[in-house]
Each structure stands twice: as structure tokens, then as C-alpha cells.
Amino acid sequence: MAEEMQNQEQQPVFQLQRCYMKDASVEMPNAPQIFAKQLEAQPVVDMQFEVAIAALSETHHEVAVRSTVTIKADDKVMMIAEVKQAGIFLIQGFDEQQMIHIGNVVCPSIVYPYLRANMADLVTRTTMAPVHLPEMNFE
């Protein structure tokens, strides 16, 4: 019985504890003027991504993925939207190399679909054309 307990303690554990939207913002610095005039050029969409990992304890880690979408037309910013989606993960029993892979690849892959949905919803609420973030391979 004691051996079984010891084996269970040594088994690697990986579990998503919580997934949440940590931050969201949208700015439309040139509204309503951008809606009133005919655009001379096609809007340009710029997307930026960032992954951040923070140890909350020896076994719990927060992994956050942030995306910033900037839409410009005629040299004017039409919209800037930013969403930061995070997850709290229980991770224990892995070696250092595995921990790096889990933090940089596995966890962001779990959190990212929620970020995509929240960004699409946020942009849609501005009445701008929908912006759908691309699928992402964190490998």
C-alpha cells in the first residue's frame, strides 16, 4: 500500500485548473470619423502575439497568451484591440526539458483557442469587419 502511494506521488501530473480572460481592451481613437468617410486604401491588419509564464508556486504556473490587433487605413488607426488569456496549470513530476516544452507549447496551445474566441467577439462588438486570429502552432 505504501509502495502504491509512493508510485502515485512520483507520477507526472498536468492539469488545467482554470482558464480566464485576464485583460481585454479596445480603442478606436479616430471614431466616429473613420466611419463617415470613404477609405482610399484597404485596411491593414497587424497582429502581435506574446506568451508569458509565471510560477505561482512550486507546482502551479500561470501561462498567458496576449494578442494585439491593430487596424490602420489611410495612415490612421481605426482600432487597437488587445486580449490576454491565461490559464493556471498544475504541473509536477516533469524534468526541466519537459517543463520548458509544457510551458512554451502545451499550455499556450490550450489557452489560445479561448483567446481567439474572445478577440473575435471583442472586435465584432466594435462593428468593424470581423478579425479572426490564425490557428497557431506553438512548436
Language-model features: where?
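N-terminal intrinsically disordered, cationic/polar leader segments
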Residues: 1-110, 114-139
